[in-house]
Amino acid sequence: MSALKTLAAALLLGGSAMAMAANDGQTRVNELLSSDPQYRETWEGVVKKEERLPEWVMNLSGTPDQQMNAVTEDGDKYLVGPLCESQDKCLNHRLIVAFSFDKKHAYAMLVDVPEGLPADKSPTRHATYRFLGKPDQGMQDLLMETLKKDPNWY
């Protein structure tokens, strides 16, 4: 019977993280803070001690590039997805965000590439990376792997 209770609790916890989806059934980074006060509280804890962050990062108010995905890192589940400053500046200013399913931890990687970079120049060689939320090496790798899934990132 306790296995059944554990399964039910896991389904409720996992389901609540996914329940705040948009009409298309997909969760996007820019919807998280308004979907649940716990997300807002956790994110504010991440950015409050950071200096010189753009407002779109502080408020997660940019343009979502794609839906968020459930990912496991070191046995813990996270909701991970990208956010762009705006649709036309996605290559230049983007944020990869990861929230734990329990909404208690959040990490991010802010990626900036100089605007006006010629098309024949690799963005990876000119990018600067800034990690938020003090992610360990495993989380940094997960955020970087999420970025590398973008076909325009080479």
Short names for language-model regions:
Residues M1-A8:
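Bacterial N-terminal signal peptides that target proteins for export
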Residues A22-V80, P151-Y154:
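N-terminal secretory signal peptides
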Residues K89-I96:
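Short, surface-exposed coil-to-beta transition loops
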